Design a protein with these regions (language model features):
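N-terminal nucleotide/polyanion-binding subdomain common to many enzyme families
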Residues: 1-80
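A short helix->loop->beta-strand "cap" motif at the edges of active sites that frequently abuts
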Residues: 29, 100, 174-178
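Short glycine-rich anion-binding loops that position phosphate/pyrophosphate groups of nucleotides
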Residues: 36-39, 158-163, 185
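A transmembrane-helix-recognition feature enriched in membrane-embedded lipid enzymes
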Residues: 66-71, 195-240
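Conserved beta-alpha
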Residues: 68-145, 149
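Short Gly/Thr/Asp-enriched flexible loops that form oxyanion-binding sites at enzyme active sites
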Residues: 116, 164-173
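Short, flexible loop segments at boundaries between secondary-structure elements
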Residues: 134-138, 175-213
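Proline-aspartate-enriched helix->loop->beta-strand connector
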Residues: 150-155, 160, 176
Length: 240
């Protein structure tokens, strides 16, 4: 767990936005992984994903409050959450302003198509060069298409760890571009699924709202977070 916390972005959203802007403007290739405790525990259990999390190519942002609090309890200073949804919304604004291009890959057909239309309507300056759902048989071919079109931002919604594995597999084909695995963010960004109410967001309780709304999440949440808390306890004991 320490090697993940060493890499987690610690400076907060405002600073990250400035760095993202520079990376976009100067065409600096970037691979962002937005992490909650389940993400980090998947890395502990999946060797390929572990190598991606630890790679010098990737930036890990603290999407979940559990990552912020866990890291801070074992001697790190992570300022605040830097969430995938907020990163994407910021990227939409600067893509629109700068007239840059976007590729959307993942989720169900109706969701990704609705998102593409919503982005086009709200951000007319964005050039959407690809809209592909996550149910295509040949996902590698989608990345070949991206390599031809050279988008400035690529959003991949295939779920962890598949989205990161696919990005990593094809990352060498690109000279530029900001690549982000966004999980279920297309559902929220498209408006097909409402983001958690402000109370839950402001108090970092989105996880509670999701469990109440979708009880089937409870088993997965419980399993990954109990293991994560155990990792934090072990690290704290070793600090004594």
């Amino acid at each position: 767990m320490k090697k993940y916390f060493d890499k987690v972005y610690k400076e907060g959203m405002e600073r990250f936005q400035k760095e993202l802007y520079d990376r976009l403007i100067y065409d600096k290739k970037t691979f962002i992984i937005t992490a909650n405790p389940e993400t980090l525990m998947t890395g502990k259990e999946n060797r390929e994903f572990d190598s991606i999390l630890c790679s010098k190519n990737s930036i890990i942002t603290p999407d979940g409050i559990g990552v912020v609090k866990g890291a801070n309890q074992v001697g790190y200073h992570v300022k605040e959450r830097v969430t995938g949804v907020d990163i994407v919304k910021y990227l939409f604004s600067i893509l629109d302003k700068e007239g840059r291009s976007l590729y959307l890959f993942g989720a169900k057909p109706d969701i990704v198509n609705t998102l593409a239309k919503k982005v086009s309507d709200k951000y007319p300056g964005i050039q959407i060069v690809g809209t592909v759902d996550g149910y295509v048989d040949d996902k590698d071919a989608v990345f070949d298409d991206m390599a031809i079109k050279k988008p400035d931002v690529v959003l991949v919604a295939l779920g962890i760890p598949m989205q990161e594995i696919m990005i990593n597999r094809h990352y060498h084909k690109f000279d530029k571009g900001i690549f982000i695995g966004v999980g279920g963010a297309f559902d929220v960004l498209s408006g097909m699924k409402k983001r958690e109410p402000h109370f839950f967001v402001n108090h970092n309780l989105e996880w509670l709202y999701r469990i109440c709304s979708e009880p089937k999440r409870l088993k997965r949440f419980y399993r990954s977070n109990i293991k994560y808390l155990d990792e934090i306890r072990k690290m704290k004991r070793n600090m004594r």
